[in-house]
A protein has these predicted regions:
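Metal-dependent amide/peptide-bond hydrolase catalytic core
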Residues: 1-14, 18, 22-23, 30, ...
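A short glycine/serine-rich beta->alpha loop
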Residues: 119-128, 191, 224, 278-284
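N-terminal helical capping/dimerization or prosegment-like subdomains
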Residues: 2-94, 99-102, 356-359
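Active-site metal-coordination/substrate-binding segment of hydrolases
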Residues: 89-159, 163-165
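Predominant activation on well-ordered alpha-helical scaffold segments within soluble catalytic domains
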Residues: 62, 135-142, 171, 205, ...
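Sec-exported extracytoplasmic/periplasmic mature domains
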Residues: 33-41, 66-67, 142-146, 299-306
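Acidic/histidine-rich catalytic neighborhood of metal-dependent amide-processing enzymes
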Residues: 130-209, 247, 320-342
Length: 362
C-alpha cells in the first residue's frame, strides 16, 4: 500500500532505471572491477594527494567519467563528476577509500573482483563500501543522459577520498565550496537511513616496562585491524607459563559461546588466540569482539603491570564484555531516538615503548 502523501516514482524514472540495468549491468561490473583493483587504504603520514594508489584510482574515475560523457573535476581530496549545467544541484555522496584488509581472510585477493567464490555475489574490498555505489551512480547518470531526461537540477557525484580515515580535509572543502541544495548519501543500508551515529575515539597508552618475575606474565597482547571494525582476532603471549595455567584456561575457554580459543604451550611460553566475529563498529551487537573476550579469559589472574599485563587488567576492570561502556566511569549514554551509545575496543597498536588501546564510540 502506498501512503496518500507519498510521491510515487514516475514512469520515466522507472523506465530509465530498467534501461540502465538492461543495458549497462555488465558495464557496471566492469567499472567496479577497475575501481576495486586500486588499494585505496589510507597510509599513515601520507597525504591522499601523495599516495600513488589514490592517484591511480582518481585517474580511473576520470577515464570512466569521460567515456560516459560526464564532466570531471579533481579537487584533491574530493572528486566531482557531473551531468548537466543547471544552477540548482543535487549531490550524490560517496567515498573512494576503503578500510584496511587482512588478505588471509579472503579466498582471493581483496583487490580483485571475485565473481566465482560465491556465485551471484561480487566480492572485493569496497564492493559495498563504497565503490559499488560509485559504479552504480555513474551508469545511472549515463542512462539519464542516454534517455535525454530533462533535468531541473544538475547531478553531481561527489567522491571523497578519506572518509575512512580523516574528515578534516572534507571540513575544509565545505568551507570553500558551495554544496548542492539537496544531497543523497549512498553509503548505508537501503532504502533510507534517517540518521547516522556520531563517531569518537578514546586512545589509552600503557607504557611498557621490564619487570623481571618468576611468575607468569603477559608479554604480548594484540588485536584489531581498524578503528571502525569489531575485531574477530586477538592474541596474547604469556611467559613463565606452565601446564597448570594452560589447563585452567582451557577449562574456562570451553564455557564461552560465540568465540573460540586456541592455546599452545611451548616450553614456558603460552600463546592464546581468540577468534570472534567481525562487524562494523556502529553495530557491535552483530559481532563478537575478540579483544575483551580474550582479556576476560585471562581475568582469573591479576597480571604484572608491565604494559601488556596492565592493558589486560584495565580491559577487565573498566570495559568488560558489555557494549555500552557502563564500566567506564559515567560515560554510558542513551538517547530516546538513537538508542544507547556503543563503546568498543577495536584496535591495539604496538609501539616501541608503549602499547595503545583505541576505543570506538558510536
Amino acid at each position: 500500500m502506498v501512503n496518500a502523501n507519498t510521491t510515487q516514482v514516475s514512469y520515466a524514472a522507472r523506465a530509465t532505471a530498467d534501461y540502465a540495468v538492461a543495458t549497462y549491468q555488465n558495464a557496471m561490473v566492469d567499472s567496479l572491477r577497475a575501481l576495486v583493483k586500486h588499494n585505496t587504504v589510507a597510509k599513515e603520514g601520507v597525504s591522499i594527494n601523495d599516495n600513488p594508489a589514490h592517484t591511480a584510482f582518481k585517474a580511473e574515475l576520470k577515464k570512466q567519467a569521460r567515456a560516459l560523457g560526464l564532466d570531471y573535476k579533481d579537487d584533491g581530496y574530493v572528486v566531482v563528476i557531473g551531468l548537466g549545467t543547471q544552477k540548482q544541484r543535487v549531490g550524490i555522496i560517496t567515498h573512494g577509500d576503503v578500510q584496511p584488509v587482512n588478505p588471509k581472510k579472503w579466498a582471493k585477493s581483496p583487490f580483485e573482483l571475485d565473481i566465482t567464490t560465491e556465485p551471484g555475489r561480487l566480492i572485493g574490498r569496497g564492493t559495498e563500501d563504497d565503490k559499488g555505489p560509485i559504479s552504480t551512480a555513474l551508469y545511472a547518470m549515463k542512462a539519464i543522459k542516454d534517455k535525454s531526461i530533462a533535468l531541473n537540477k544538475r547531478i553531481e557525484l561527489y567522491i571523497y577520498m578519506a572518509e575512512e580515515s580523516d574528515w578534516e580535509p572534507l571540513k575544509a572543502y565545505i568551507k570553500t565550496h558551495e554544496l548542492p541544495q539537496t544531497n543523497i548519501t549512498i553509503d548505508a543500508e537501503y532504502p533510507v537511513v534517517t540518521a547516522e551515529k556520531g563517531y569518537g575515539t578514546v586512545k589509552l597508552v600503557f607504557n611498557k616496562q621490564e619487570k623481571p618475575t618468576i611468575l607468569p606474565y603477559v608479554s604480548e597482547f594484540s588485536g584489531g585491524f581498524f578503528g571502525s571494525q569489531i575485531p574477530e582476532d586477538a592474541s596474547a603471549t604469556i611467559e613463565n607459563a606452565n601446564i597448570v595455567l594452560l589447563q585452567r584456561l582451557m577449562r574456562k575457554a570451553r564455557s564461552y559461546q560465540g568465540v573460540s580459543f586456541d592455546l599452545e604451550l611451548k616450553g614456558s611460553t603460552l600463546t592464546v588466540n581468540a577468534l570472534g566475529k567481525s562487524a562494523h563498529s556502529s553495530k557491535p551487537e552483530d559481532g563478537v569482539n575478540a579483544i575483551p573476550y580474550l582479556a576476560d579469559l585471562l581475568s582469573s589472574t591479576r597480571w604484572e603491570s608491565n604494559g601488556p599485563g596492565t592493558l589486560v587488567n584495565f580491559i577487565n576492570d573498566n570495559i568488560g564484555l558489555g557494549l555500552e561502556g557502563k564500566m567506564f566511569g559515567n560515560i554510558a549514554y542513551k538517547d530516546d531516538f538513537m538508542g544507547a551509545m556503543t563503546f568498543s575496543p577495536t584496535v591495539i597498536k604496538q609501539h616501541d615503548k608503549s602499547i595503545e588501546l583505541n576505543i570506538n564510540l558510536r
